[in-house]
């Protein structure tokens, strides 16, 4: 089951970013071996009482005029309603209850999503509670007083948040259909690809409402097998502000990727691969999803015998951190190569669920270490005692070593490459965990 998504909504300057940063602490993982991926602090992974969830800060630009503020808050609320399992609605006790709070509260109430009302900047719970009680007038339940700066009141808020997380159901576990998120920048043809896949195959297509979110999934049957496609295209209300569009695009991507097994990153062939493509790709890569890069609008490109080769190299340079990704050149307009997507999805699902026997794995490890010695530091060399696979989706391996401090991502990448040479794992990331073990054990 995917991790729940918690979105933070509120007026400018009520302390959303302070709350976000305080809850995340040092848990935002910077992937050091991921060049080209700039990590926005729009989303982060948070853990509370054995509950893991993705926290999203919906706030983007903070304009000055009241009308624009209300308009932007509505967009924040809309994206939260659309993508989140639980919404934290943040207000400011010092500014008091204002009209835009009431209007956004009305939107949130109609969404039927769990809304946690948080009143920030309560520096003294004893003295300021009468001011906090004013927020009962919003009609969305009990206001929780906090001080984001002083980290007061977080426990009660987080307890309330996790109490609303959906329970895993039997149907979740039994649904073994591949779930494929179509991700990418706005206007690269994501919806067009799904529409063409639906139209081409002339089969019964059901729109399945997400169990906890408003996203619509499309189930398509091809060669007797069902696939679920998750579309991240377009907000219901289009923002006119470029930075908001980009932020909302990322939030929608996080929400879709959390629920998917495989992500198809759609790139516009006429624009080439961009930094924004790399940023979006990084979301799927960090979450260990299978990845297909679909270069759309290929029919609009003037080609010679080197065009595919040159474009592929450009993708591999810009997205070097996910060299394992499958690449396909397609046209949503003509349907060119779209049916090959199913073949790639099946292939990646097999790779994601592949298990390597420990004995075979350690033969590969022994050969790799013999060919290239592990790194050393201050006269002490890294020793890798053995390796075992502990999980799938993505394939995850534990390496038992003498000193975790001696491990280096470049040597781990070398081991990964040896494993890929032996077993493939095309289209899926591989994860490694280093564990220390004393030599006598």
Curated annotation (Swiss-Prot):
Superkingdom field: Bacteria
Gene Ontology molecular function, alphabetical: ATP hydrolysis activity; GTP binding; ribosome binding
Domain KH-like: from-to ranges: 354-438
Binding annotation for GTP 1: 10-17, 57-61, 120-123
Binding positions (GTP 2): 184-191, 231-235, 296-299
Domain EngA-type G: 4-169, 178-353
Key word GTP-binding present: yes
Keywords: GTP-binding, Nucleotide-binding, Repeat, Ribosome biogenesis
Any GO BP: ribosome biogenesis
SUPFAM superfamilies per the UniProt record, alphabetical: P-loop containing nucleoside triphosphate hydrolases (SSF52540)
Record carries keyword Repeat: yes
Pfam short name (any one): KH_dom-like
Record's subunit section: Associates with the 50S ribosomal subunit.
NCBIfam families: GTPase_EngA (TIGR03594), small_GTP (TIGR00231)
Described purpose of this protein according to its UniProt entry: GTPase that plays an essential role in the late steps of ribosome biogenesis.
Family recorded in the similarity comment: Belongs to the TRAFAC class TrmE-Era-EngA-EngB-Septin-like GTPase superfamily. EngA (Der) GTPase family.
Protein name as catalogued: GTPase Der
Organism of this sequence: Lachnospira eligens (strain ATCC 27750 / DSM 3376 / VPI C15-48 / C15-B4) (Eubacterium eligens)
Gene responsible for this protein: der
């Amino acid at each position: 089951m995917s991790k729940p998504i918690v979105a933070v909504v509120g007026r400018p300057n009520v302390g959303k970013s302070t709350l976000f940063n305080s809850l995340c602490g040092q848990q935002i993982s910077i992937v050091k071996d991921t060049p080209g991926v700039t990590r926005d602090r729009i989303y982060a992974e948070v853990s509370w009482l054995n509950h893991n969830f993705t926290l999203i800060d919906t706030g983007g630009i903070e304009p000055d005029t009241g009308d624009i503020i209300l308009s932007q808050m509505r967009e924040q609320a809309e994206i939260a309603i659309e993508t989140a399992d639980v919404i934290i609605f943040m207000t400011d006790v010092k500014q008091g209850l204002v009209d835009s709070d009431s209007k956004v509260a009305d939107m949130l109430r109609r969404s039927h999503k769990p809304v946690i009302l948080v009143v920030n900047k309560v520096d003294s719970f004893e003295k300021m509670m009468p001011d906090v009680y004013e927020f009962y007038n919003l009609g969305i339940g009990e206001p929780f007083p906090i001080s984001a700066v002083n980290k007061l009141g977080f426990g009660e808020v987080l307890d309330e948040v996790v109490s609303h997380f959906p329970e895993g159901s039997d149907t979740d576990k039994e649904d073994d259909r591949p779930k494929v998120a179509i991700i990418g920048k706005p206007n690269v043809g994501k919806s067009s690809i799904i529409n063409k896949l639906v139209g081409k195959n002339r089969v019964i297509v059901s729109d399945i409402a997400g169990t906890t979110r408003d996203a619509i999934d499309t189930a398509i049957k091809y060669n007797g097998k069902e696939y679920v496609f998750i579309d991240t295209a377009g907000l219901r209300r289009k923002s006119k502000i470029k930075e908001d569009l980009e932020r909302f695009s990322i939030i929608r991507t996080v929400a879709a990727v959390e629920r998917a097994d495989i992500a198809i990153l759609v790139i516009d062939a006429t624009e080439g691969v961009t930094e924004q493509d790399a940023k979006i790709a990084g979301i799927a890569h960090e979450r260990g999803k299978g990845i297909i890069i679909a270069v759309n609008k290929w029919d609009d490109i003037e080609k010679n015998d080197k065009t595919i080769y040159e474009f592929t190299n450009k993708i591999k340079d810009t997205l070097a951190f996910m060299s394992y990704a499958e690449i396909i050149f397609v046209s949503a307009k003509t349907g060119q190569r779209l049916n090959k997507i199913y073949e790639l999805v099946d292939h990646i699902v097999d790779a994601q669920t592949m298990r390597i026997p420990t004995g075979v794995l350690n033969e590969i490890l022994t050969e790799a270490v013999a060919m290239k010695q592990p790194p050393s530091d201050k006269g002490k060399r890294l020793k890798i005692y053995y390796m075992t696979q502990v999980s799938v989706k993505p394939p995850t391996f534990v390496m038992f070593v003498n000193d975790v401090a001696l491990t280096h991502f470049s040597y781990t990448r070398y081991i990964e490459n040896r494993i890929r040479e032996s077993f493939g794992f095309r289209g899926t990331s591989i994860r490694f965990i280093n564990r220390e073990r004393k030599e006598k054990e």
